Amino acid sequence: MFEYELTLPSESDAEALIHVENECFSIPLTVEQISAQIRDERFILICARNSKQELVAYAGMYYVLDEGYITNVAVLPEARRLHAADALMEKLEQMSVEKGLSFISLEVRESNTPAISLYEKHGYKTAGIRKDYYQAPKENALIMTKKLSEEKN
């Protein structure tokens, strides 16, 4: 299994994060949006770096009160199926429990079966559908959720 160093980003990581965004999403975030997330105290952003210290993946989550909302899990194509997303999901959950969150949700494209499998593997359940949520191309989103409260007791 590949080992990743999981780090919190600094402003100097914005360009590398944008590279991952551009490789993974049809409508990527801008440098300004990424920089705002890095500075936002209610946003958790975790980077996965390979043995060469290259940023190959990241995950982001907003949280308010006891709820978290995963905005992105992005992995460069050459790093997929090498467990970077697993490491990021585990770290997000660990940090969520540490912050006292009891519930996490996310949206995922209906056609993104690898991501759906990843989320199910980590205990997420489909809770509903958002019609035409995604653009470029237009597609429904599955709403997936996970309760953490039982794990805190």
Language model segments and positions:
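Residue-level recognition of the GNAT/N-acetyltransferase active site
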Residues: L76, R80, E107-S111, A136
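Conserved acetyl-CoA-binding loop-helix of GNAT-fold acetyltransferases
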Residues: V75, R81-M95, T113, S117-K121
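Conserved hydrophobic beta-strand within the GNAT/NAT acetyltransferase core sheet
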Residues: I70, I104-V108
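Conserved active-site tyrosine of GNAT-family acetyltransferases
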Residues: Y119, Y124, M144
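Short coil/turn segments at alpha/beta junctions that flank glycine-rich nucleotide-binding fingerprints
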Residues: L82, K99-S102
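Conserved catalytic-core motifs of GNAT/GCN5-like acyltransferases
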Residues: E107, K125-L142
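Acetyl-CoA-dependent GNAT
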Residues: F2-E78, M89-K91, M95, K99, ...
